[in-house]
Amino acid sequence: CGIDYYTRAPGYNNESFVIYMFIVHFLIPLFIISFCYGNLLCAVKAAAAAQEESETTQRAEREVTRMVIMMVISYLVSWVPYASVAWYIFSNQGSEFGPVFMTIPAFFAKSSALYNPLIYVLMNKQFRHCM
């Protein structure tokens, strides 16, 4: 299940599909994730500033910051290889690419659903306690 990089028929519009996939399924989610997590970090910092700067507040702020950074990194690790390979193949049409070249990035992209729950379980004591 993936993009058909080999069909070169003019009626298939592969170029517009790759551009659409890159923008709608990679760049826009990356922007939304960055925007939302950035706002979350600002809200946590504002809440911490409003409270007395205790060790507990600072520790909670560090934990949230670490978790947000891990979430963004996991998104990038999962989707940058796939988006890069798709863009590379799009830019080098007519070149031969082996199945491993396309399979490994697809594996990373499709395994992305595992990363967020793992990050929550490994990095959040309250989440672990509730399980």
Curated annotation (Swiss-Prot):
| Subcellular localization | Membrane; Cell projection, Cilium, Photoreceptor outer segment
Q: Which residues lie on this side of the membrane: Extracellular?
A: 1-16, 89-100
Q: Name one GO molecular function term.
A: 11-cis retinal binding
Q: Topologically, how does it sit relative to the membrane?
A: Multi-pass membrane protein
Q: Which GO terms describe its cellular component?
A: membrane; photoreceptor disc membrane; plasma membrane
Alphabetically ordered keywords of this record: Cell projection, Chromophore, G-protein coupled receptor, Glycoprotein, Membrane, Phosphoprotein, Photoreceptor protein, Receptor, Retinal protein, Sensory transduction, Transducer, Transmembrane, Transmembrane helix, Vision
> Where do glycans attach?
14
Q: How far does the signal peptide extend, from start to end residue?
A: none
List the stretches on the Cytoplasmic face of the membrane.
39-66, 123-131
Where in the sequence is N6-(retinylidene)lysine found? Answer: 110
Q: Which residues cross the membrane?
A: 17-38, 67-88, 101-122
Q: What InterPro entries does the record tag this protein with? A: GPCR_opsins, GPCR_Rhodpsn, GPCR_Rhodpsn_7TM, Retinal_BS, Rhodopsin
Q: Which GO terms describe its biological process?
A: absorption of visible light; G protein-coupled opsin signaling pathway; visual perception
Q: What does the UniProt record tell us about how this protein is modified after translation?
A: Phosphorylated on some or all of the serine and threonine residues present in the C-terminal region.
Per its UniProt record, what PANTHER family does this chain match?
A: OPSIN (PTHR24240)
Question: What protein family is recorded?
Answer: Belongs to the G-protein coupled receptor 1 family. Opsin subfamily.
Q: What does this protein do?
A: Photoreceptor required for image-forming vision at low light intensity. While most salt water fish species use retinal as chromophore, most freshwater fish use 3-dehydroretinal, or a mixture of retinal and 3-dehydroretinal. Light-induced isomerization of 11-cis to all-trans retinal triggers a conformational change that activates signaling via G-proteins. Subsequent receptor phosphorylation mediates displacement of the bound G-protein alpha subunit by arrestin and terminates signaling.
Q: What is this protein called?
A: Rhodopsin
User: Corresponding gene?
Assistant: rho
